[in-house]
Amino acid sequence: MTSKIARNLGKSYEKKMYQHLGGMPSTIVLRFSNDTFDEVTKKRYHKKLNQFDGLVLPLDASDETSDTDLQYISASNILRNYANSNRNKEQRVYQELKEYNFWRNLYGTKGIALVVYLLIIVREITLHGTIDIKNIFLNPYPDYVVLILMTLYAVTFVLFVNKQTVIIKAFDYAKSLIEVCERI
């Protein structure tokens, strides 16, 4: 049940991220304005994808229109379906997807986690009454272990679980997904 909640919170953030970025990362990296792939590689991928019925990807930046993103979304869906049905051959894509989903869902639960950590920290401080800073460092066991751990977890969450990490993982997945063009 908690994994479903985490996923729903992560998916909720994902929609906001797509709006902020101007589309899905797999769509963005196919655009000529994006430099994830060099222009020669991008043209080669577009030609390869144009072999699929109904796809007409531009072969030059000047050919991109406002409707081109629909073609890029369709191309991404083709690659995603291929990668999902060939997980044994496309293990890197699957690994990048799992990492992206992990960080997206973790970021989605960040608020809840920080509230829980804060409640535990307040509980520990309340139980001890007065906090002896000297004992926290010199004699932390057993009195201050939970307080120290929860504080470290909260700080770690604040520092490392952030939007930028999720965006980086999203583009890592998008890049590996589009690179499937090399193997189809």
Model-found features: residue ranges?
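Transmembrane alpha-helices and immediately adjacent membrane-cytoplasm interface residues
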Residues: 1-14
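Alpha-helical transmembrane spans of integral membrane proteins, capturing the lipid-embedded, hydrophobic core
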Residues: 1-4, 117, 151
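Alpha-helical transmembrane segments of polytopic integral membrane proteins
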Residues: 2-3, 122, 174
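Alpha-helical transmembrane signal-anchor/signal-peptide segments
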Residues: 11-19, 170-177
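Charge-rich cytosolic interhelical loops and cytosolic tails of multi-pass membrane proteins
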Residues: 14-91
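Transmembrane alpha-helical segments and their cytosolic interface motifs
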Residues: 80-132, 140-141, 146
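Cytosolic/matrix-facing juxtamembrane and C-terminal tails of multi-pass cellular membrane proteins
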Residues: 139-140, 155-184
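Short acidic, glycine/tyrosine-flanked loop/strand segments centered on an H-E-D-like triad
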Residues: 146-158
